[in-house]
Amino acid sequence: MTVLIHVLGSDIPHHNRTVLRFFNDALAATSEHAREFMVVGKDDGLSDSCPALSVQFFPGKKSLAEAVIAKAKANRQQRFFFHGQFNPTLWLALLSGGIKPSQFFWHIWGADLYELSSGLRYKLFYPLRRLAQKRVGCVFATRGDLSFFVKTHPKVRGELLYFPTRMDPSLNTMANDRQREGKMTILVGNSGDRSNEHVAALRAVHQQFGDTVKVVVPMGYPPNNEAYIEEVRQAGLELFSEENLQVLSEKLEFDAYLALLRQCDLGYFIFARQQGIGTLCLLIQAGIPCVLNRENPFWQDMTEQHLPVLFTTDDLNEDIVREAQRQLASVDKNTIAFFSPNYLQGWQRALAIAAGEVA
């Protein structure tokens, strides 16, 4: 049987590193279909840190896409597992027959599915991508993204799968000893990416709570983002006093980020799509409820796991937040499907489906 090849078709270092390390540590030892990767980006020590994997790096999306298409045409039994996909050439290859549906298996990361960019180039490309998505052999996604996808692609097979968030399961039972009274601390957004709509989110928080809460905005990733960070900081200072606004411009190491999250009382995310599942997982693990846009279908996954969900359209106050905290504290976090190690079973099944080992 031909070994499955995994494709990370866009240079998104943080996510790509997470996926590679997860495969190296959790999957490669038990499945030959979890070892071969083609990745856009620089090695930056990844090969050394993932010795169980065979990783081929490419300088750009186009060079990777050309290599994938060549392999697909040379051997029609070759199957590919595409993790996220910001790569137009690959979509066009699927649409034109360069890659066959039986060769194309796709793990939706959220942003790949939604059509939120307003640029002309994107608006012209979206209809073509939509047509190509009808030809995918099987999609893997969160419950919410599957329900979104099936509305326009009802004939494509869909399977539940969660991004492998880096988590320490031993923290599931750790009580959050933060004092749950007095001034609340609210985390706004999951990164410095503009998709977080930071300014609109800060205005929404201010409209709900005024200048009575402390707001923390993590913007250390992606790099080279100083102008936008300053724009967000200035907008925040028009709404909140300096002592109540903390805009973080430096990238935090994992343990430092975890410590930051555990100082919060609430996460506030206004983006109208599924994203930031890693931050959501870490907040929930720490007993911190989250406010979501009702257009973000991940609320379906949360309610399926009996987790409290607050919405940006709700009338929020401290009593409501504290009640959500109490509800979250009563949940057995070891049973949550999108937590580690529970998502591992979904990945093992996804590998078997993509490799053709199970129907």
Swiss-Prot record:
Localization: Cell inner membrane
An individual GO BP term: fucosylation
Keyword Hydrolase attributed: no
Catalytic activity of the protein: beta-D-ManNAcA-(1->4)-alpha-D-GlcNAc-di-trans,octa-cis-undecaprenyl diphosphate + dTDP-4-acetamido-4,6-dideoxy-alpha-D-galactose = alpha-D-FucNAc4-(1->4)-beta-D-ManNAcA-(1->4)-D-GlcNAc-undecaprenyl diphosphate + dTDP + H(+)
Pathway: Bacterial outer membrane biogenesis; enterobacterial common antigen biosynthesis
InterPro entries: WecF
Pfam families according to UniProt: Glyco_transf_56
Keyword annotations: Cell inner membrane, Cell membrane, Glycosyltransferase, Membrane, Transferase
Molecular-function GO terms, alphabetical: 4-acetamido-4,6-dideoxy-D-galactose transferase activity; fucosyltransferase activity
The UniProt record lists the keyword Cell membrane: yes
Mode of membrane association: Peripheral membrane protein
This enzyme's EC code(s): 2.4.1.325
GO cellular component: plasma membrane
Enzyme class, broadest EC rank: transferase
Coiled coil: none
Function: Catalyzes the synthesis of Und-PP-GlcNAc-ManNAcA-Fuc4NAc (Lipid III), the third lipid-linked intermediate involved in ECA synthesis.
The family this protein is said to belong to: Belongs to the glycosyltransferase 56 family.
Protein name: TDP-N-acetylfucosamine:lipid II N-acetylfucosaminyltransferase
Organism per entry: Escherichia coli O9:H4 (strain HS)
Higher taxonomy: Bacteria, Pseudomonadati, Pseudomonadota, Gammaproteobacteria, Enterobacterales
Gene name per UniProt: wecF
